[in-house]
């Protein structure tokens, strides 16, 4: 959407991932790639930073040199590197998005170097985790169930409102928890 809002309908997009063995990062990348299927954007070969923001910045700077229209970082280190590379480039044409939540990422969003970051909901994760532990300690069968605790999208607007835009999944997880 951010690309379309800038009138960019095609171009190359870089991906900076942690590594090729961290399951959550692999899934994040797969979802990102899936979102671009059937579009005119070319997703470049993923580069790995091992979670190191400085290495991620170098990777992102190389993508920028190649002329990408956007870059995605799959974790805090990768996202920080992406934002710092966009900042260093001086360009306001490159769209940067990330994953995870930190004061550094919030600053990069507020300063306009990242459009947004997807943040897990640690309070919800902790709350539901403790509830599951209590059930298990009481001998209840958890059935191997996976609980989606949702994700929140942090944008310049939501940060200015000192709030968070919840996805439907996060709202559904809250509703399910209230019913319990």
Where would I find each of the regions flagged by the language model?
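Structural recognition of the beta-strand scaffold that forms the well-ordered cores
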Residues: 11-16, 45-46, 70-73, 95-99, ...
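Short beta-strand elements at the ligand-binding edges of bilobed clamshell
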Residues: 1, 46, 111-123
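Hydrophobic alpha-helical
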Residues: 32, 50-108
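Short, solvent-exposed amphipathic alpha-helices that sit
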Residues: 23-42, 81, 85, 125
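Hydrophobic alpha-helical segments within soluble ligand-binding/sensing domains
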Residues: 1-10, 56-57, 101-105, 120-138
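Hinge/cleft segment of the Venus flytrap/periplasmic-binding protein
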Residues: 12, 16-20, 24, 35, ...
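Solvent-exposed, acidic/flexible segments
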Residues: 21-25, 49, 53, 71-75, ...
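Short beta-strand elements in bilobed, periplasmic/extracellular small-molecule ligand-binding domains
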Residues: 12-17, 33-53
